[in-house]
Amino acid sequence: MAAPVMDTCHVSCCANRAPNVVSWGRGGLIAFGTCNSVAIYNPEEIRVVDLLNKHTGRVNAVQWVHEPDCSPENQLISGGSDNNVIVWEKLDGKFRACAVCSGHSGPVCAVDAVSLSSSHLLVASASSDSTVKLWTYSSDAAECLQTVAFGSGFMMDVSLALLPGSRVPVLACGGDDSRVHLYVQLSGQFQRVLTLTGHEDWVRGVEWANKDGELWLASCSQDCLIRVWRLFAKTAAEPDLQTDGIIKMKENIFQVSGEEFAVTLETVLAGHENWVYGIHWQPPSVKGDSVEQSLKLLSASMDKTMILWGPEEDSGMWVEMVRVGEVGGNTLGFYGCQMSPDGSMILAHAFHGALHLWHHDSNQEWRPSVVISGHFNAVQDMSWDPEGEFIITVGSDQTTRLFTPWTRKGSSQITWHEISRPQIHGYDMQCLTMVGRFQFVSGADEKVLRVFKAPRNFVENFAHISGTSLEKLLGCNDIADLPEGASTPALGLSNKAVFQGDLASPSPQQDGGDFNSLSDQYKESYFQPLKLAEPPTEDDLLQNTLWPEVQKLYGHGFEMFCLASDCARTVVASACKASKAEHASILLWSTASWKQLQSLSCHSLTITQMAFSPNGQLLLAVSRDRTWSLWRRGNPDLDTEAMFSLYANTSKDTSVHTRIIWSCDWSADNKYFVTSSRDKKVIIWGHAVSGVAVGEGEDARVTSCSSVLDVGDSATAVSICPFLCSDHSYLLAVGLENGQILLYKWKPLEDLSSESDWSRCKDTDACQGHTMVVKRLRWRPRLGRGGHGGQDSKEEQAWVQLASAGADHVVKIFDINLSAL
């Protein structure tokens, strides 16, 4: 079998901010909504194995369709803010959208489904249009069976089951009227048979479980309580005894086809201190020829805890068995919870999208486990470190995140993980650039640039997790005077360095004295050094992996928009948003003194992206004014830094682009640069004289060297691979506004009229691409795949890696086989 041209190596993402967005299947796979996609995540391999793209709005609800025999599921239901419900089915090992249920007039917030037969599904969906719709699905077709209207009320969750001893479906709905409504299908239509009262605030979750011929219904509410109800069939011979001294719970009775069913309140569980958003029964398991349901109930709350409840064996009284949760940070609590098929792992997803996983170890203790993480808003920019061993990303979720491959001892498995969150800011992040291996500059929706440098604790942990030699890292980076870590003051935005002395200072209690000042009781530093052998948990990422801020750079009048640094890491260029020429200047900064070197003025509107040439002699800038400018470094005097002067530029009359130019990049040999624009055009520029690096010929004019490539959609990102293909052509990646990534090969030709200089190599398929704008594309600066250094070097020479960042909150890394192009 031929090697694939493009393979997805890593997907970084997190769960959407919705209560019903995560579902753990009997096959061990976790499905969750991330922006407009449904991610299929394997917790054993710790990686996303598939992304299902069909929704055009945020995915709010995901639910596996469980098989009666507890076998791995082949069907999945999702609902989104595009008002649609989609039925996914696994065919030939891949999930595909088999039916789109359209009919709601508002976002879908909850879904559930039950198998009526091997080929028929009953699907329920709740929406903010104040209705619950019932759908039937069979043979790749779905139709609306019934719409249940709730007037001005909203149903927050729905759950379907089959009545004991029958194939009659029963529907539970929990909503903002603080009640749980039960509907049963009678004569083909669902009719309300009972309303269960007791909750004193919105009901956030409902779920059925089937045990020993009885149905158990759990409901959770914003009143911080959980109620467990029991539904059973009443037998005709059952006596109605009124025994003195015995308290009997009230029975709510309804009839279906002449048979009586009763619902009683089994227990009320109080233990959470904030709204309870999610509940989940432990999945049933197969024991011999029968299916057994355990009465263990998991709950998740905004108080940052999950509780596992269950009845005591002796008394039958429901008690709290396990409580786990998140400590520290300024985050809100949990939105939902799930349990693995065998009950050995429990999962929560938090307000900011983070997944929290605990496993039951051999000592019967619950321990945190490694899980994927990602941005919970648009990813705006990213950069590889100069050695290609990690990437740093920034996003509109106000965080900067660092990802690296995790190399396990004695295992060939390599997965990428977030190992540091250098910056947690108060403004949406916009741009960054690396300045050396362990230093970067970032810009946000503020006028200030901030410079960060890695602490000693990060360098040590990076070496342990990535399998890199610590001695090698120490050799390239003088860490003798580096701080241990960083922490953020309670009311501050700047990460303050924490040194060894700050950690070692004894507390007053240790000296036997009393507190003598407020500073003893309320310390500025919350940092604790970590010695990591595996990627950190969300708690540690929030609190113990910050990088100290070493400098602030002032000079811009508006919010930052783009950054670039030269290959020698001596100069940083920055630009901000601008609607006038006076603000559309490029500021150059010295990385030695962090002083402003120069201001370069040419453009009249926002500069959207900049790139230094690989030899560091030229600076390219593209702008919203539809033009580009090229600046050349002069020869430095003995006492002054080299100054940049305008070398070439296009005007509105000479520019080939007719809309905003979004992106630009250089070829590794300095001979060409590329621009991409909203007008769907990608153009390569250089000297008409073949083989001359841009800027070397005094009389040579910079002109377009390629035919105009029309990519069919707004080209929002472009990047040239630093390595040539086997036929000595240049490899380019182009990111589009619709989320697709295209690979092209380009070869300089004398005759451009035939457009044969471009050849299309590969397009991302429906699962590989993004679902929203591609914001940034970056090639790894070295051949090979990150973390595969120990493999046969000749084999690795055939591979390059491409990282992409999208407005769909996702960061992806692709393995691209140069020999297969």
From Swiss-Prot:
Per the record, what about its domains? Answer: Folds into a two seven-bladed beta-propeller structure which is required for elongator complex assembly.
Compartment list? Cytoplasm; Nucleus
Tell me which Gene Ontology terms the entry assigns under biological process. tRNA wobble uridine modification
What's this protein's name?
Answer: Elongator complex protein 2
Q: Which InterPro entries match?
A: Elp2, Haem_d1_sf, WD40/YVTN_repeat-like_dom_sf, WD40_repeat_dom_sf, WD40_rpt
**Swiss-Prot/TrEMBL keywords:** Cytoplasm, Nucleus, Repeat, tRNA processing, WD repeat
Q: Which organism is it from?
A: Danio rerio
* Pathway assigned in UniProt: tRNA modification; 5-methoxycarbonylmethyl-2-thiouridine-tRNA biosynthesis
Q: What does the function comment of this entry state?
A: Component of the elongator complex which is required for multiple tRNA modifications, including mcm5U (5-methoxycarbonylmethyl uridine), mcm5s2U (5-methoxycarbonylmethyl-2-thiouridine), and ncm5U (5-carbamoylmethyl uridine). The elongator complex catalyzes the formation of carboxymethyluridine in the wobble base at position 34 in tRNAs.
Secretion signal span: none
Specify whether Nucleus is a keyword of the entry.
Answer: yes
> Partners and quaternary state?
Component of the elongator complex.
Lineage of origin: Eukaryota, Metazoa, Chordata, Craniata, Vertebrata
**Lineage: superkingdom:** Eukaryota
**Residue intervals passing through the bilayer:** none
UniProt similarity note = Belongs to the WD repeat ELP2 family.
Q: Which residues form a coiled coil?
A: none
What GO cellular-component annotations does this UniProt entry give?
A: cytoplasm; elongator holoenzyme complex; nucleus
Q: Where are the WD repeats?
A: 14-53, 54-98, 103-145, 151-193, 198-239, 271-319, 329-368, 374-413, 424-462, 602-641, 656-695, 715-754, 769-821
